[in-house]
Amino acid sequence: MSIEHQSYVEPLGVKGKVILTSFLGLDANNIFQQNIFLNQLSNFVNLNCSTVVSLVEDSEFDQLCEKKLFVRNIYNHNLKWIHMPIADLKAPDHEFKKKWITTKTLLKNDLLKGNNIVLHCKGGIGRSGTVAALILIEHGEENANAIKCVRKKRQGAIENELQEQFVLDYRTIS
């Protein structure tokens, strides 16, 4: 599968792309399937992805699949894994913001090297869209335009007023 078959945004000034997706490994009935998950990971490797960022909370892992198995398979595919949980339908909280200071640098470096990164939440719309917009802003995009760019590529992204306001208010800090 080519990158064109994915929902992605392209930060300014880098070759890498940010792929937005739902929870990895889910079938049409939202049931985790190991074979689907492994195929997705192989596809991400073929698409020159370097990092998978999980935006779901531990309770969501508990509902969908075994977290240890999930992470082990990501590492087995020589991908990096970053866990940046955000509550469903919410904007990033204080813990996210603290961790984001270092995480955004790691992601920027991946993108500068031309690697693609994968953002996923449960549905691949709200939290993934919000963080994708933050990455665009970190690369020089104006806040409102970052929202437009993400929504153009992923319909329904940044799914509520709380997330939208967070992106509009976001200020990049070095």
Each language-model region and where it sits:
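Cys-dependent protein tyrosine phosphatase-like superfamily
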Residues: 1-118, 130-174
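Short cysteine clusters
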Residues: 121
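Conserved G/P- and acidic residue-centered "switch" motifs that form tight phosphate/ATP-binding loops
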Residues: 124
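Conserved SAM/SAH-binding loop-helix junction
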Residues: 127
